[in-house]
Each structure stands twice: as structure tokens, then as C-alpha cells.
A protein has these predicted regions:
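Active-site region of the double-stranded beta-helix
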Residues: 1-117, 127-182
Length: 182
């Protein structure tokens, strides 16, 4: 379902799939062979293949990301994209150890929202709120589908069915003052 999120506190938001250039950069920096072989896939196909990875392959991929992230955090000269991804991997791995959702989070666009910023997510778009407090505005519905990073019910196959073909990053919307105090 479509939704708009408005940050109350600083927030980390994951939404859609990173552009292929960023995916390739991350695959190389993290030594993520599981991703290198999938960079050219459509966003929907990439997410589908990651969600359907056998658990033993996912466990190896997660361990590789966590190990690489810890090394990259101490290196100088890494790009902001790689540094932010390393921070994300560490944060998610600590909150949800061993969760396959980490692999999905790794390929998603990371947005940092300041208080008052908002981002619109269309229906069929994978998204997650990693940290922070927000107000969510959405259509009434009971069809929340989860693929990981939660203790709640997960229905990854149903999520795959409703994923949109395009998984672009939303446009960040910043508040503008309309006058004194408004």
C-alpha cells in the first residue's frame, strides 16, 4: 500500500533498490559474490532471488557482510556509500542477528531523514524504517507484508507476489516555511 512517512526525529529509511552502479560498488567493497552475480537483474528479480536464497547460502552471505563491514569501518578512504552500508550492516546485524532480511536491506536505498522531512513510498515498493520516530500516513488496509527484520509474522512469498517491477528511491521532501512561524 502507498504510504508517506514524516520524520519526527532523525530517521534511517530503506526503500526500493539501489542503482546498479551502487550495487556493483558495494559488491566489490564487501566481497559479496552473491551480489556480484545478480547486479544486472531487474530490481524485482534481485529481491526475489535474495529472499529465496537457501538458508545456508544466506548464512554465508550474512557472515561475509558482517566481517567485511567491521573491516571497512576501520579503513580510510572508503566512499560514503560504502561507509553508510557498513554502518547499516552493523546496526541490522546487531538488532536481528542471522536474519536474511539483512541481505535485502543491504541492496536497498538508504535515506537519512531529518525531522520534518518526508518520503512517499508507492504501493509495491519494498521499504523499512531502521531507526527513528515518524508519523506514517497510509490508506486503511490490513495487508502489511513482512520479509524479515521483525519478530512479527513473515510472509516472504506473498511479498514477492506484490512487489512492483520498479523499486526506485523516493524523492526526499523537505518542509518549506510559508511565513513567520508557519
Amino acid at each position: 500500500k502507498p504510504e508517506n512517512v514524516i520524520a519526527i526525529t532523525p530517521m534511517k529509511v530503506l526503500t526500493g533498490v539501489r542503482p546498479q552502479g551502487e550495487l556493483q560498488e558495494l559488491a566489490e567493497a564487501f566481497g559479496a559474490d552473491w551480489l556480484s552475480s545478480r547486479v544486472q537483474l531487474s530490481p524485482k528479480q534481485l529481491l526475489t532471488e535474495i529472499i529465496r536464497l537457501p538458508q545456508d547460502a544466506a548464512d554465508r552471505a550474512i557472515a561475509g557482510l558482517v566481517n567485511a563491514a567491521q573491516k571497512l569501518m576501520t579503513q580510510d578512504g572508503v566512499s560514503a556509500t560504502v561507509s553508510d552500508a557498513a554502518d547499516l550492516v552493523n546496526l541490522v546485524a546487531q538488532k536481528y542477528p542471522g536474519d536474511k532480511g539483512l541481505l535485502v536491506a543491504f541492496v536497498m536505498n538508504l535515506m537519512n531523514l531529518a525531522p520534518g522531512d518526508s518520503a512517499f513510498t508507492p504501493d509495491g515498493q519494498v521499504h523499512a524504517y531502521v531507526s527513528g520516530t515518524a508519523i506514517e500516513l497510509m490508506n486503511p488496509s490490513d495487508n502489511v507484508l513482512r520479509a524479515g527484520l521483525t519478530p512479527k509474522h513473515i510472509d516472504a512469498e506473498e511479498l514477492i507476489k506484490v512487489l512492483g517491477e520498479h523499486q526506485d528511491a523516493p524523492v526526499l521532501q523537505r518542509p518549506a516555511a510559508n511565513g513567520l512561524g508557519v
